[in-house]
A protein has these predicted regions:
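A structural signal for small-residue-enriched, beta-sheet-centric alpha/beta enzyme cores
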Residues: 2-81, 85-98, 105-408
Length: 408
């Protein structure tokens, strides 16, 4: 974790204990951080699992194995290594992951494919098997820790621990969620975009859990960007221990299914926002809302073209109401747009309507809005009913400083 805390940081929430999910931490020593860097979460037998993963074709062995093993639907453990991504490391990297899976599986007397592993850090450095083995051994013997301690342990360039919670009533039974996430740089929307872990005590069929997570992901994690770079290790996993005692949710027709899906979506959205708020060097949180598109998917792609534009992001960093850069980003998005119907605004003040600047446009309220930390950009394409909101942060000198020195 970085010593310099983001000005957009949020306090860590009070996360509930989740029956059947117990976190532990240990120090493997992947980097000379002087802190714990390995997280182990023990899961009750029968825990359902769902996941979404990066589509970066240079993904890590952790992602490859996780993507394959999530299909069997159940999990007994999660292990997260911080300080070494183990991506692009060939057979040695895969052997290191399989060794962790085998070690934990032997401890729990479960199949290795029910042990999920994630790693984060520098690409191209094999995970040291001896350090991993010792770290896992220490974690297996460690006393349980808090969710906040686990959240701190999975971080790399993160400046604050990130967590979210929610609850839902299912046929009179309260089910709870506790979630942690890490992410600060190399964040772009492509399935996941960081390492996120969601735990609930609800009883949920694995296929239904996957459907809910995939839907929530599309509307939350896939709508954020910090720097347009999609990591080789991106993973979001959801675990449902089934300990709450509710009637199992098997489809959207199950009583309480809508409430469960809504709570899961709320957790994912909160986590996604926290990642943006911890964007490397970020000073401002930006919400880009696009309306009037030919479809919601088209609106999302236009929004991301704006959110990924270095010129837009640096203008926001400089508190410059240069709405022409938004026009540029819309035009390059490759989506249906009509120059003569396009409208652009900041903070609820329209600067241009129907393809031209407003004659009575007053930049003063926009300039005042841009001095704040919470920025909104509004775009109306004037073509249809499609809408979407995406979230990003500004681009500052701090981002360059962090990434120029990342390996040192």
């Amino acid at each position: 974790m970085s010593e310099a805390r983001s000005p957009l940081a949020q306090p860590f929430p009070a996360l509930p204990a989740i029956a059947g999910a117990t976190p532990h931490i240990a120090r493997a020593g992947y980097k000379d951080w002087g802190r714990c860097d390995l997280t182990y979460v023990a899961l009750a037998e029968g825990t359902a699992v769902a996941g979404v993963f990066t589509r970066n074709v240079c993904c890590s062995s952790e992602v490859e194995l996780g993507r394959t093993n999530v299909a069997q639907g159940h999990a007994r453990a999660l292990v997260v290594n911080a300080g070494n991504s183990n991506a692009f490391t060939g057979y040695r990297g895969r052997e290191a992951v399989e060794a962790i899976m085998a070690q934990v599986a032997a401890h729990l007397a479960c199949p290795p494919e029910q042990v999920f592993v994630s790693s984060t850090g520098v690409i191209g450095v094999p995970l040291p098997k001896d350090k991993a083995r010792a770290g896992v051994e220490a974690a297996l013997a460690a006393a349980p820790c808090s969710w906040e301690e686990a959240a701190n342990t999975i971080g790399t360039t993160d400046t604050f621990a990130k967590g979210a919670t929610a609850s839902a009533m299912i046929s009179g039974v309260k089910v709870q969620f506790a979630a942690i996430i890490k992410g600060s740089g190399m964040i772009a929307p492509d399935m996941a975009t960081m390492l996120g872990y969601i735990f609930t005590d609800a009883a949920v069929d694995p296929a239904f859990l996957q459907a809910c997570l995939s839907d929530a992901n599309q509307r939350t994690f896939s709508c954020i960007t910090v720097d347009s770079d999609t990591s080789t290790s991106d993973t979001v996993l959801a675990f449902a221990t089934g300990q709450a005692g509710n009637a199992p949710l098997v489809s959207f027709d199950s009583p309480g299914a809508d409430a469960f899906a809504a709570a899961l979506h709320d957790v994912c959205r909160s986590l996604a926002h926290l990642v943006v708020r911890d964007g490397e060097g970020a000073q401002k949180f930006i919400a880009v809302t696009v309306s009037g598109a030919v479809s919601d998917a088209s609106a999302r792609r236009v929004g991301l073209a704006i959110a990924n534009s270095p010129l837009v992001k640096t203008a926001i960093a400089g508190e410059d109401a240069n709405w022409g850069r938004v026009v540029m980003a819309v035009g390059k998005a490759g989506e249906p747009a009509d120059r003569d119907r396009l409208s652009i605004g900041f903070g609820g003040t329209w600067a241009a309507r129907d393809g031209q600047p407003l004659a009575d446009y007053d930049e003063a309220p926009v300039a005042a809005h841009l001095k704040g930390q919470e920025i909104t950009i509004e775009v109306d394409l004037g073509l249809g009913d499609g809408t979407a909101t995406v979230w990003t942060c500004d681009l500052t000198h701090g981002y360059i400083a962090i990434n120029a020195d990342y390996r040192s």
